[in-house]
Amino acid sequence: MYRTFAAALLCALFAAPPASARGLPVGLSSQLEAQLQTNRKRYGIAGQAVLVAHNGQVLYQGASGERDPASHAPATVDSIFAAQSMAKLLTSTLVMQLVDQGKVDLDAPASRYVQDLPTAWQAIHVRDFLNHSSGIGEYYDRVENRWVSKGYPGVAPDLAAALKVAGAAPMQFATGSRVQYTQANYLVLTALLETHYRKPYPAIARERILQPLKMTSTSWGVSSVPATRAAVPYIGKDGQLQPANEDPWPDYGWGHADLQTTIGDMNRFLQALATGKLLRTETLEKLWQPQKLSGGGSNFFSTGWDTTRSDGYTQVGHDGGTRVRARLAYKGTLASGYWVFVYLTNGSARNAWSSTLVESAMAVGAPQEFPHAVLSERLIGYALDDSADAKPQMRSWLRDSNGVPTGELERAINADGYAIRESLGAGKALKVFTLNTELYPDSANAWDSLAECHAALGEREAADRLYAKAKALAKPSP
């Protein structure tokens, strides 16, 4: 029955025309509702709310599951979810406003704007703090399931103390050489904003973002959320949901965590950015360009926004607590058109990646626009389909109608394999990695990923044999 349902969903998914602001494709709402139900069954999602918009028009918003499984209270589009690190998007936007006004230079040392930074941080640019390429240490550790700053029974009592704790830690790497996601980076940005405005961070964010945009359901800290609307966070353990029981963050940490919000408020925020209501769109488009790392490659953060470039689109956004994600996608310029996708959950039994969830909405909402998202969803269906005709059908679709450029397909399948391994287990991902070696038998990377998957399953002999094959393929020809 599951496969029949999944097959029907996939047929609808791939037949759907792209949504447009002039008219909704027939059945889009029912297709997205079906996808939400599929995701809930597939990953054991407690509760979820999803919004899809194009050029300012909301094409779909819906919810399913329970905002509080303990009381069986249903999730609704007005439920308030713990968005955690999506708080960084507000902080980044506040800094970008100062850049837009010519008051902050991202390539100047943050010490120009913040006094008393640790000596080792004096030359670190604002951009590196935004993009997690600063190399600084963290201001807390996880000790017995609690946040603890060194020298304190819990987290440091205030912002200055927290910065001193982080400053006492050794530099983790040369600034600008690589990326390490570190909350202390956003303490520096919080200090920068509070120094400039001479106000506490929450007051700045309310005055410059929340109040002008009427984001009345957005706040910080679970204690700020009405119990009748709170989506209680859960995590997966041994395939079962259990309460997350997350520690609250101190208010000085609200620039990086503890955001509480709804799909509607996040849509208002992203729409305002896309239309120049918070800062000029030409400034945004410059700031959402990749940072080159001295250690090689590009940073996947652009002024603090998680950034990918796929299907001709620049896609920016952020995860929150691994449970939620917001994404804004535009092709070329924001003026040429944009999409907004917001996918909020309060947890899943399989701890599904938020990127996997938001891409499932992209695959259904605009399949012709986002073929990489369609590929991801199709591969997930293949990994779960044990029928004999699953592989020939998958290969036929990949050959004839997948929409991903040939030169990008191997890498895309490999990346999707890892996402499937994380959310559904190595056993399901094995099918995808095996398929990739069949499609690209001369790829050392494809065989290496397959070997790694066998190793994760405890199949050491098979893993060693495949690692050897990958190594042989990687050797340059004499």
What do the PLM-derived regions correspond to, one by one?
Residues 22-62, 194-199, 203-207, 211, ...:
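Catalytic loop of the DD-peptidase/beta-lactamase superfamily, centered on the K-T-G motif
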Residues 26, 42, 46, 66-182, ...:
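Active-site-proximal loop and beta-strand segments within enzyme catalytic domains
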Residues 50-57, 82-105, 109, 129, ...:
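Alpha-helical scaffold elements that line and support the substrate/ligand-binding pocket
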Residues 63, 78, 141-144, 149-227, ...:
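Catalytic-site signature segments of enzymes, centered on catalytic residues
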